[in-house]
Amino acid sequence: NLYWATCPLSNWFIHRQYAPLNLMHSMGLKVCIGTDSLSSNHRLSMIDEMKCIMSVFKEIPLADIIKWGTLNGAEAIGADNLLGSFTIGKKPGVVLIENADLATLSLTEQSISKRLV
């Protein structure tokens, strides 16, 4: 299986452009989200990467972006039998996203993440 990794804030930091995530989404490609490193990013934050995608690619639903940051990443590294979703037998980390807009199912500038488990 082929997965496309994107680190949008790093892409902007280095190239001042983003991968064509709207096209990749419309084609049904498997995308996963990363942060790259501090040499090409101001901080390592998955929620910031997700907020960036939401602000630039408004047509991509939050549910898909969350999947890109969870299950798709686990599948890409071959760890989906342990991580990436709440399934019996798995032991995923649990991260709470606070200050999301539940009416529009979107992240806001105030959205933050907090690791619970």
Q: Which residue ranges define each predicted feature?
A:
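Helical hairpin unit composed of two closely spaced alpha helices linked by a short loop
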Residues: 12-15
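Charge-dense, low-complexity polyampholytic segments
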Residues: 83, 107-108
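Composition- and surface-driven signal marking solvent-exposed, interaction-prone regions
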Residues: 17, 108-110
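Acidic (Asp/Glu)-rich catalytic clusters
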Residues: 1
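Short peripheral tails and domain-boundary helices/loops at the edges of structured domains
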Residues: 112-117
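His/Asp/Glu-enriched, well-ordered alpha-helical/loop segment
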Residues: 7, 17-99
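Short, Lys/Arg- and Gly-enriched loop/turn segments at beta-strand edges
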Residues: 101-107
